[in-house]
């Protein structure tokens, strides 16, 4: 019997994986740079803080990594507050666990 459920939001509950690439691409575009596929591949194995240091160095940006990270996180936060949608069937699935009084986090 299931005793509890721990969810991973990105890509499981929410259709949200593309926002990180969009936020990074926008951050670079505002500085006249283009996010390439190889950088995307490398960045997705990093934490956001590591990623901001990586793009600062790789693209020779003058802004501090903390400024880049803040800009990226503002865009990601806007997405979660205003645009993120549950993946198909998620609401019913979660409601089913709730109806069975199974704790979720």
Residue ranges and their predicted role:
Residues 36-37, 52, 88:
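Short, hydrophobic secondary-structure boundary micro-motifs
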Residues 55-92, 100-102:
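Metal-dependent phosphoesterase signature
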Residues 21, 25, 48-53, 65, ...:
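An amphipathic alpha-helix signature
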Residues 1-42, 99:
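Active-site neighborhood of HAD-like aspartate-dependent phosphohydrolases
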Residues 17-18, 49, 91:
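Alpha-helix N-cap/helix-start capping motif
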Residues 45:
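N-terminal phosphate/diphosphate-binding loop that engages ATP/GTP or pyrophosphate donors
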């Amino acid at each position: 019997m299931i005793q509890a459920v721990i969810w991973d939001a990105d890509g499981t509950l929410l259709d949200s994986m593309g926002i990180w690439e969009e936020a990074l691409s926008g951050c670079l575009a505002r500085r006249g740079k283009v996010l390439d596929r190889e950088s995307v591949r490398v960045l997705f194995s990093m934490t956001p803080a590591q990623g901001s240091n990586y793009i600062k160095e790789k693209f020779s940006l003058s802004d501090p990594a903390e400024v880049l990270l803040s800009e990226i996180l503002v865009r990601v936060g806007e997405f979660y507050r205003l645009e993120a949608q549950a993946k198909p069937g998620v609401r019913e699935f979660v409601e089913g666990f709730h109806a069975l009084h199974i704790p979720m986090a």
